[in-house]
Regions:
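CE4/NodB-like, metal-dependent polysaccharide N-deacetylase domain
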Residues: 23, 39-72, 77-80, 107-123
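Aromatic/hydrophobic pocket-lining residues that form the small-molecule binding cavity
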Residues: 10, 42, 46, 104-107, ...
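Structural recognition of the beta-strand scaffold that forms the well-ordered cores
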Residues: 1-2, 23-28, 62-66, 85-89, ...
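Generic structural signal for hydrophobic
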Residues: 14-17, 79, 114, 141
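His/Asp/Glu-enriched short active-site or ligand-binding loop at hydrolase and phosphoryl-transfer sites
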Residues: 70, 75-114, 146-149
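Solvent-exposed loop/turn segments at secondary-structure junctions
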Residues: 4-8, 23-24, 30-34, 59, ...
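C-terminal domain-boundary segment and adjacent tail
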Residues: 5-9, 129-149
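Active-site beta->alpha N-cap acidic-glycine motif
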Residues: 1-61, 147
Length: 149
């Protein structure tokens, strides 16, 4: 799930995600709390990034993750009316503070222990810890009989 700013600053990575067949999800233009916005603002946060991805990558996004996981019945309705399915997560941890990163060993154990069929992990790209443990995490989860889809 990307913000528009990230897609604008990392075109090679976004193209690689698409070329490798990954689902690229919409996380909005500005990372505003969707329930605090009116209908036009909600639609703009979703549709403007949607148009950017179509115009710049010829890619149509279909899943949306509301910033901070904050949503309301109203914002879910707006999201659906924009043609999106809302997708949240089953696991998240405090990995977003670049100057307060979790311990690698503890983080790896948390992630591996949270594995279950259908698990959806929320891992932030700004996390050095996540970057450093990702290979080991993938190997251990696969060794536990799980697959990534």
């Amino acid at each position: 799930f990307l913000l528009q700013d990230y897609a604008e600053k990392n075109p090679e990575l976004v193209k690689r995600m698409i070329d490798e067949g990954h689902i690229v999800g919409n996380h909005s233009v500005h990372h505003y709390s969707m329930p605090t916005l009116g209908q036009a603002e909600c639609e703009s946060e979703i549709k403007d990034f949607h148009k950017y991805m179509e115009d710049n990558y010829d890619y149509t996004m279909t899943v949306f993750r509301p910033p901070m996981g904050e949503f309301s019945e109203f914002s879910l309705g707006v999201t659906a009316n924009c043609g999106y399915e809302t997708e949240l997560w089953s696991f998240a941890y405090a990995d977003w503070a670049v100057n307060n990163q979790p311990d690698e060993g503890q983080a790896l154990e948390k992630l591996v222990n949270a594995a279950h069929p259908g698990a959806i992990y929320l891992l932030h790209s700004v996390s050095k810890t996540n970057t450093d443990i990702l290979g080991d995490f993938i190997d251990r989860v696969r060794a536990g009989g799980f697959e990534f889809g």
